[in-house]
Amino acid sequence: MELVLKDAQSALEVSETTFGRDFNEALVHQVVVAYAANARQGTRAQKTRAEVTGSGKKPWRQKGTGRARAGSVKGPIWRGGGVTFAAKTQDHSQKVNKKMYRGALKSILSELVRQERLVVVESFGVEAPKTKELKAKLKAMNLEDVLIVTAEVDENLFLAARNLYKVDVRDVAGLDPVSLIAFNTVLVTADAVKQIEEMLA
């Protein structure tokens, strides 16, 4: 299959297994959920009545004082006592096989092509790290909510895009399923397309 280059009167020959496969919604959902879960820190922690510092002594005798009976100052109804169902540190990470991860990326890329949200250009960059220059370039292409994917890290492009709302720059190595579905349009250079094919082969 071919992808038409927006800035040149030519097309790029690409693999149909990477850019022309059926959309597997269940797989994409599983990988995106796992990716989000793996980003969770999970370091919250509270103390139960067993872990709170304090005496184990009964505060006052069981009968005769007129007060409600109490067996510990560490109970959850006491100020400074433990938490009834205390939150504990958790590992939320989910295992994602390489085959699943690659399959999800291929599925997303194919769907972007079908929806005409994948824009391929011969090359893309800015001469200086100026937001104004990049904004003008994107406006000329009628692009606003866009992820720019380059073959290598382009520092000028990264710095120029840093202050733009709904614009992000990634190299192929930093590509992930969540960033691909987070933007309306994905702008990819021809070199990046070749690298993506090699990575997902």
Swiss-Prot record:
HAMAP family: Ribosomal_uL4_B (MF_01328_B). One of the primary rRNA binding proteins, this protein initially binds near the 5'-end of the 23S rRNA. It is important during the early stages of 50S assembly. It makes multiple contacts with different domains of the 23S rRNA in the assembled 50S subunit and ribosome. Residues 45-72 are annotated as: Disordered. Keywords: Ribonucleoprotein, Ribosomal protein, RNA-binding, rRNA-binding. It holds the Pfam family Ribosomal_L4. GO terms for molecular function: rRNA binding; structural constituent of ribosome. GO terms for cellular component: ribonucleoprotein complex; ribosome. Belongs to the universal ribosomal protein uL4 family. It comes from the Bacteria. InterPro entries: Ribosomal_uL4 (IPR002136), Ribosomal_uL4-like (IPR013005), Ribosomal_uL4_dom_sf (IPR023574). This is Large ribosomal subunit protein uL4. The lineage of its organism: Bacteria, Pseudomonadati, Pseudomonadota, Gammaproteobacteria, Alteromonadales. The keyword Cytoplasm does not apply. Part of the 50S ribosomal subunit. One of its GO terms (biological process) is translation. SUPFAM superfamilies: Ribosomal protein L4 (SSF52166). It comes from Shewanella baltica (strain OS155 / ATCC BAA-1091).
